[in-house]
Amino acid sequence: MEKYKLIALSGSLRKASYNTALLHSIIQLGEDRFDMEIASIELPLLNIDLIDPDEPEVVLSFKQKVREADGLLVVTPEYNHSIPGVLKNAIDWLSLEPGTPLRGKPVMIVGASPGILGTARCQIHLRQVFATNRTNTLPGNEIFITHCKDKIDENGLHDERSIRHIDKTLSEYHDWITFWKRNTKN
């Protein structure tokens, strides 16, 4: 089985983030199928004046990492029923034309929240944003970790049902990337 290179983003900057802990658990679960690198989304706020004549170096480096990856994994909380600002800012930087690294990129979205809906509303908005940028977001297979305070701690995800679901979805994501690599002209 071919191992794919993924860039992974945590939509939270919080040190004790449930989603960053979840992301580390996903990296361990998928290490037989993926080489994952967590990329920082601590980028300057998007300001078109900053790209005249060139984008900031930190943004260029971030975009290059995403461009070179076989896929993009996003693990995020939900803020105010939507996408955290820091994550939306990173996606906005990636979306700039010409040469967006998002077009055609296979994307998998995961999220954890203390509430009963997980990150359902955020993921709907992310799917809309990614569709606008012509990504190949994994259909179905939503992973909403609800009541995350009971399922994730400083050691990561410990809920067996969620672990099985994520492991199954990682296999489906691997197949999704394989499909797009075989059926997309570069």
Tell where the protein language model's regions lie, with residue ranges.
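N-terminal beta-loop-helix "entrance" segment that forms/cooperates
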Residues: 40-57, 152-153
